[in-house]
Swiss-Prot record:
Encoding gene (name): nodC
Protein name (Swiss-Prot/TrEMBL): N-acetylglucosaminyltransferase
Effect of V151A: In strain: USDA 61
Keywords: Cell membrane, Glycosyltransferase, Membrane, Nodulation, Transferase
Chief site of localization: membrane
Organism from which the protein derives: Bradyrhizobium elkanii
Length: 182
């Protein structure tokens, strides 16, 4: 009986110790990073920053929501080449989206593709990917607002040859508004 109690105590203690080490490592790794230091680290390491194509499929999106999304992409602090491909997937409210498209059509980083009819999100993404030429492709939903350093952070992660894909942490803007989002 004493052997069983001792073994159990050792197992519980070991688990507690290993869990503490693991959680500490997670907390340390998850500390916010300074985006300018990420770019400086990449540049000092002689890394040529890859070109990034951001694809934004949209369908019947609210014009203000789409405008906020595109503004957040336009304001990225990424030092490399950034292109944005917006695919309107046959929206019925194109007359309302026209002014948003017009604003960004004059920005050489932006390309607007107007699909003749709704073909679905996946096919809209495929249309954007086929017209992309970037080293990396970032897919962004049309109702997403990116922090200014998102592209820089994702590119930094993609410099590791063992990494094949990277994604950001999503934070719902309405997370405190309703019981569904709390």
């Amino acid at each position: 009986m004493d052997l069983l109690a001792t073994t159990s105590a050792v197992a519980v203690s070991s688990y507690a110790l290993l869990s503490t080490i693991y959680k500490s490592a997670q907390a340390l790794y998850a500390q916010p990073t300074n985006p300018s230091s990420l770019q400086n680290d990449l540049e000092q390491a002689g890394v040529v920053l890859p070109s990034v194509d951001v694809i934004v499929p949209c369908f019947n999106e609210d014009p203000n929501t789409l405008s906020e999304c595109l503004a957040s992409i336009a304001s990225q602090d990424y030092a490399g080449k950034l292109r944005v491909i917006v695919v309107d997937d046959g929206s019925a409210n194109r007359d309302l989206l026209g002014p948003v498209h017009k604003i960004y059509a004059s920005d050489p980083r932006f390309r607007i593709i107007l699909m003749a009819k709704n073909v679905g999100k996946r096919k809209a993404q495929i249309a954007a990917i086929r017209s992309s030429s970037g080293d990396l492709v970032l897919n962004v939903d049309s109702d997403t607002i990116l922090a200014v350093d998102v592209v820089t952070k994702l590119v930094s992660k993609m410099q590791d040859p063992d990494v094949g894909a990277a994604m950001g942490q999503l934070v719902a803007s309405n997370r405190n508004e309703t019981w569904l989002t709390k």
